[in-house]
Amino acid sequence: MSEPRLTRRARKDLETLPQTVREAVLETLTLIGIEPERVGRKLVGRLEGLWSARVGHYRVLYTIESGTVLVRAIRHRAVAYRRGRH
């Protein structure tokens, strides 16, 4: 695959993370770009179509469409799966 694209929301989420978490997320984004199905897990129910990768207490939420990975949000696990825009 290729480097994941980030939505405006995901870029903003990334900028607000603590430095150590941001570094771990960037490493995970590299892995997602290589093997997105292996790094994350497919979500079900109302979040069907999204994938989620764990990074400590944070979750990287993304979609895989036509070989392109689009990161939609990077949120703390307590709020990652709540209704809202992903």
List each model region and its residues.
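Enriched for short, Lys/Arg-rich terminal
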Residues: M1-P4, R9-E23, T63-H86
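Hydrophobic "lid"/C-terminal helical patch
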Residues: L29
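Short proline/glycine- and basic residue-enriched helix-capping loop/turn segments at helix->loop/beta transitions
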Residues: I32-E37
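Basic/aromatic recognition patch in beta-strand/loop cores that engages polyanionic ligands
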Residues: V39-Y81
